[in-house]
């Protein structure tokens, strides 16, 4: 007997098999008829037999259905079936195929009665069985995730999110839901989306003061951490910068963590390394369901061929294994600048000359992680003025703060974190020096240092960047269902 998920519908229970549930029961011995629903990935008619590959989005693997052809009516019926159509299939029988790539297949002996066409497609349905570039697929936001390559990245995203939840729960973190609407700019960069209503003449009339979409939930997390000790969130964040690059979005998701009783940057980096390695280990253990079975060339203007599946799969597996097995390095920002200057002056010039006191550029980050260390690297202790106001100042004379960025090969920075300044007077002086809090808009934040404060710190992980890196696709537009950038209008 096949086991299926059971749902309540209209007061009655009914069972529904999925493609994934069939793969999970490959060793069954039941001869019961099988019913399943899905979309046609491909169909091929030969002289006496037809092969139909069905997908339903639950598995990276399609379901092979074999249809013996016994008369012309069956042939004519199958000729109307096309890629992308929705089918409801009944009375299929299980056939074990242990010596083939797919360990089983379904067989239908009366396709006219057993196959019901539920949803047709138009004559110009764009997702035919042919090579398509990622650039082209991005122009099809309502259909692109029906492809094997892009649906797999969403399943990976779902899996990784679930693994984070399990890990944090096991380690006594509380998941919280901080607000999206805020009156503050956490990063101090001024690149904010201001919120107004369609009936209010000014942006401040609804809430009584200017209100924005959050760029980070960190300030609110600090409030909650001082009650819960350990908390985390996965929330949408918004930045109104004009960057249209493979690494930037106007709307993205940030996994943010805040912990009390943290006294050193090393405590934060050790926790980050342990956490990420735990997530990667779970991915490796489930690689058969996570690794895509189709790849699309990163050369988006070249639509001539698909890349070798085995080669691409091995590259992803190697990346995952290296994240676990390779040494993660730890250097200061000052050390990083020295390394970059030597490369810039002695080997080849960067586009942006590395200078102490200036933020690291993407090319610098990629060189450090991808060429110099060839592994993840934590860069710590940045100059104070390179970073936001809330970071804890180091006791050293070099005017740096206790912070870190995690750089990974091929992508650059994916995580940033810091100790938070818990000294009331130092925090006030820093904000005054930056011209902040002149109207008392951050008094609530500063006052936390007077009401049972504790040493604390945390970090934020750009979720799309992390998923893109794991998947081997370094354009984060493909790691979020509906990407938003300044370069493209929002049509829905």
UniProtKB/Swiss-Prot annotation:
It catalyses: tRNA(Asn) + L-asparagine + ATP = L-asparaginyl-tRNA(Asn) + AMP + diphosphate + H(+). Keywords: Aminoacyl-tRNA synthetase, ATP-binding, Ligase, Mitochondrion, Nucleotide-binding, Protein biosynthesis, Transit peptide. GO terms for molecular function: asparagine-tRNA ligase activity; ATP binding; nucleic acid binding. CDD domains: AsxRS_core, EcAsnRS_like_N. SUPFAM superfamilies: Class II aaRS and biotin synthetases, Nucleic acid-binding proteins. InterPro entries: Aa-tRNA-synt_II, aa-tRNA-synth_II, aa-tRNA-synth_II/BPL/LPL, Asn-tRNA-ligase, Asp/Asn-tRNA-synth_IIb, NA-bd_OB-fold, NA-bd_OB_tRNA. Transmembrane segments: none annotated. This is Asparagine--tRNA ligase, mitochondrial. Pfam families: tRNA-synt_2 (PF00152), tRNA_anti-codon (PF01336). Catalyzes the attachment of asparagine to tRNA(Asn) in the mitochondrion. PANTHER family: ASPARAGINE--TRNA LIGASE, MITOCHONDRIAL-RELATED (PTHR22594:SF34), ASPARTYL/LYSYL-TRNA SYNTHETASE (PTHR22594). GO terms for cellular component: mitochondrial matrix; mitochondrion. It comes from Saccharomyces cerevisiae (strain ATCC 204508 / S288c). Its EC number is 6.1.1.22. Present with 784 molecules/cell in log phase SD medium. It is an enzyme of class 6 (ligase).
């Amino acid at each position: 007997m096949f086991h299926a998920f059971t749902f309540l519908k209209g007061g009655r229970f009914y069972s529904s098999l999925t493609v994934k549930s069939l793969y999970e029961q490959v060793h069954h011995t039941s001869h019961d008829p099988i019913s399943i629903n899905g979309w046609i990935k491909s169909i091929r008619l030969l002289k006496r037999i037809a092969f139909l590959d069905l997908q339903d989005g639950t598995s990276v693997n399609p379901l092979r259905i074999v249809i013996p052809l016994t008369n012309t009516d069956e042939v004519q019926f199958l000729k109307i079936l096309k890629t992308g159509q929705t089918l409801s299939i009944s009375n299929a029988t299980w056939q074990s195929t242990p010596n083939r790539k797919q360990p089983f297949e379904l067989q239908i002996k009366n396709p006219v009665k057993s196959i019901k066409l539920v949803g047709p497609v138009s004559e110009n349905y764009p997702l035919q069985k042919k090579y398509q570039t990622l650039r082209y697929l991005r122009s099809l936001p309502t259909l692109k995730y029906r492809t094997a390559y892009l649906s797999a990245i969403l399943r990976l995203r779902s899996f990784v999110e679930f693994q984070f939840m399990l890990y944090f729960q096991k380690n006594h973190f509380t998941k919280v839901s901080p607000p999206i609407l805020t009156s503050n700019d956490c990063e101090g960069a001024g690149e904010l989306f201001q919120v107004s209503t369609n009936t209010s003449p000014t942006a401040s009339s609804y809430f009584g003061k200017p209100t924005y979409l959050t760029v980070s939930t960190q300030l609110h997390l600090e409030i909650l951490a001082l009650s819960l000790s350990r908390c985390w969130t996965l929330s949408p964040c918004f930045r109104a910068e004009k960057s249209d690059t493979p690494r930037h979005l106007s709307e993205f998701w940030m996994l943010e963590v805040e912990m009390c009783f943290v006294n050193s940057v090393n405590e934060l980096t050790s926790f980050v390394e342990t956490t990420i390695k735990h997530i990667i280990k779970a991915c490796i253990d489930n690689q058969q369901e996570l690794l895509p079975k189709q790849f699309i060339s990163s050369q988006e203007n070249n639509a001539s061929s698909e890349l070798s599946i085995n080669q691409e799969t091995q590259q992803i597996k190697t990346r995952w294994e290296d994240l676990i097995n390779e040494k993660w390095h730890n250097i200061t920002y000052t050390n990083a600048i020295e390394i970059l200057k030597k490369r810039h002056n002695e080997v080849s010039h960067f586009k942006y000359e590395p200078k102490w006191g200036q933020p690291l550029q993407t090319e610098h980050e990629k060189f450090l992680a991808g060429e110099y260390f060839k592994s993840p690297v934590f860069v710590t202790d940045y100059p104070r003025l390179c970073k936001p106001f809330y970071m804890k100042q180091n006791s050293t004379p070099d005017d740096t703060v206790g912070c870190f960025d995690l750089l990974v090969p091929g992508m650059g920075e994916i995580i940033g974190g810091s100790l938070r300044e818990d000294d009331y007077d130092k925090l006030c002086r820093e904000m005054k020096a930056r011209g902040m809090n002149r109207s008392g808009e951050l008094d609530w934040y500063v006052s936390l240092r007077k009401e049972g404060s504790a040493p604390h710190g945390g970090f934020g992980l750009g979720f799309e960047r992390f998923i893109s890196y794991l998947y081997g696709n370094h354009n984060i537009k493909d790691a979020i269902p509906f990407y938003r950038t300044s370069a493209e209008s929002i049509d829905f």
